[in-house]
Amino acid sequence: MINVGVFGASGRMGQAVIQALADDNEAKLGAAIVRKSSNSYGDSATENEPVHFISADELQPEQVDVLIDFSLPEALTENLKLAEQYQLPIVVCTTGLSEEQKERLAQAAETVPVLYASNTSIGIALLEQLVGISSAALPNADIEIFEAHHRHKKDGPSGTALSLGQAAAKGRQQSWDQVNDGIRADGLRSEEGIGFSVMRAADIIGEHQVTLAVAGERIEIGHRVSNRKTFADGALRAAKWLEEQAPGFYSLQDTLNLQDILQRMLKQ
């Protein structure tokens, strides 16, 4: 049985992961980690297991085998220090990370297994692959990405939307910095630019659509999430996989073995 520690355990996604663990036969909640200022601090985190909400400095290494981080970007540095100190694999699902914070992830991956996924949906992992293949096959297509989330989401474009843009650029062997148009204030696209449209409304959990358009036709590849359990299940699946890996920097695609699947299909 794998013991899982959850950062941001009192938040919406933290609670979804705790519920997923309660329904799982291979893993269980080892630690529910929150800030000491949280209203949940000290309370019971589960109904059936004697696990209470604790702060990060109260975590004991024997409590957990792997960590899942659904906390805020400002907590990342301390969370990574804890993973490094106790040599624990960590799945980082926090969105809105800066480039400096992403570099810190890569640094931590030199000593512990780190998996970074701004979106832990298996469907999104597949979508990124499809976008990369499609952009490579249609090198002259205009690419636009639309994303929609709930009204309280703070970052935009979402980390997932940016990952899709990066997948498209990689498919064309382009520099992401050179083709990223961002959210265009004037509506004008650059020659090879990849642009973004953003919606924040009501309780939308997550929608992403990538459009590849050429004269006379277009391809639209999309993904919608209707339940946060999708993300929790994906994060837990990633944590189980990561617990068995050597130190390194991994993505959700690595857990799905998509490269081998694609190579096998191409040989048929």
UniProtKB/Swiss-Prot annotation:
It holds the Pfam family DapB_C. NAD(+) binds at G8, A9, S10, G11, R12, M13, C93, T94, T95, A117, S118, N119, T120. Pathway: Amino-acid biosynthesis; L-lysine biosynthesis via DAP pathway; (S)-tetrahydrodipicolinate from L-aspartate: step 4/4. It is an enzyme of class 1 (oxidoreductase). Disulfide bonds: none annotated. It is found in: Cytoplasm. PROSITE patterns: DAPB. One of its GO terms (molecular function) is NADP binding. Catalyzes the conversion of 4-hydroxy-tetrahydrodipicolinate (HTPA) to tetrahydrodipicolinate. This is 4-hydroxy-tetrahydrodipicolinate reductase. It comes from Idiomarina loihiensis (strain ATCC BAA-735 / DSM 15497 / L2-TR). The gene is dapB.
